[in-house]
Each structure stands twice: as structure tokens, then as C-alpha cells.
């Protein structure tokens, strides 16, 4: 996180992951496959600006990107990439903060996770026990925080 100018904060991160199963007793049939839920590229960017117009107001947002990945050990289930946008505004009083948030601004439908061992099957070669979890829709949140 850095401050390009006073009251403006910007942060970013990115990751590149090149993962694959190696031949082993448990995962021999999947050697060379990508493990489930591992995106090759991920990244985040966020920013906020405070004291807008001299008011105790901070606004900001974030963008998150997750690349395509697989939802199973055999690499038969494709999970599409997705990009999420979140926004917030916070008004700060003497002993309180009032915050409004919008999560998933564009109402993106995506799969954040696949559970390979959903049925608690102990055999790693069992590939049909997947549970695919769908994303939450666009959500609005309002919170109040008090300091006593």
C-alpha cells in the first residue's frame, strides 16, 4: 500500500502459480494435472480517498481477478475466470463509523470454490464427489460501529 498524494491510498498484489500434481502413490493417475481451485494468475487492486472536501468521509473500492482453474483432480471441470468489483463509503463521527458497501457491483456469477472431497471420499482418484459453490449475488451492506 502506498500514498500517491495525501489522503489517497492505493494497494495492489498479483500472483502467478504454476502448480501440478507429481507422480506419487496417491496421485499417480493425475500426474501433470493442475490441482483443483488453483488459478495460474490472480490479482487485486484497491484504493481509497479520505477527508473528501474536508468532511470525515472516505470512499474506496477494489477489483479482484481470478484466472480460470479446474474444479477437480482430473481437470475435467472448468471453473471460469472472474473479476469482482466492490465499493464502500465511510462517514466517521466522534465515536462512530457509518459504512455502506456494495459487494460484487457487476453482479458477476462465478464459482469461487469446488470441494473435491465433498463426500469425504478418501480415495484421491475418486473424481465425482465435487461440490461446486456458486457466488453470492450483488449485495448491499450498511454497518454502524460505535466506540464506547
Question: Can you name each region flagged by the protein language model?
Answer:
Residues 1-73, 143-147:
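Gram-negative outer-membrane beta-barrel transporters
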Residues 31-35, 49, 75-77, 88, ...:
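Outer-membrane beta-barrel proteins
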Residues 30-31, 85, 101-103:
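Short, solvent-exposed micro-motifs at the edges of structured domains
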Residues 1, 43, 74-76, 89-92, ...:
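Generic hydrophobic alpha-helical membrane-segment signal
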Residues 65-72, 91-148:
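C-terminal beta-signal and adjacent terminal beta-strands/loops
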Residues 30-31, 78-82, 117-121:
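Short, low-complexity, polar/charged sequence segments that are solvent-exposed and flexible
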Residues 33, 37-43, 81-85, 94, ...:
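Residues that define the transmembrane beta-barrel architecture of outer-membrane proteins
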Amino acid at each position: 500500500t502506498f500514498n500517491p498524494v495525501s489522503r489517497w491510498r492505493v494497494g495492489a498484489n498479483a500472483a502467478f502459480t504454476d502448480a501440478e500434481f507429481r507422480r506419487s502413490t496417491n496421485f499417480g493417475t493425475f500426474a501433470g494435472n493442475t490441482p483443483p481451485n488453483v488459478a495460474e494468475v490472480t490479482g487485486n487492486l484497491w484504493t481509497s480517498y479520505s477527508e473528501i472536501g474536508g468532511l470525515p468521509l472516505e470512499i474506496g473500492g477494489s477489483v479482484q481477478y481470478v484466472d480460470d482453474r479446474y474444479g477437480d483432480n482430473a481437470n475435467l471441470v472448468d471453473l471460469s475466470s472472474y473479476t469482482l468489483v466492490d465499493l464502500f463509503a465511510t462517514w466517521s463521527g466522534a465515536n462512530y463509523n457509518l459504512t455502506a458497501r456494495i459487494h460484487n457491483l457487476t453482479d458477476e456469477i462465478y464459482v469461487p470454490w469446488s470441494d473435491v472431497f465433498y463426500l469425504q471420499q478418501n480415495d484421491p482418484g475418486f473424481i465425482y464427489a465435487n461440490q461446486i459453490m456458486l457466488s453470492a449475488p450483488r449485495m448491499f451492506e450498511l454497518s454502524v460501529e460505535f466506540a464506547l
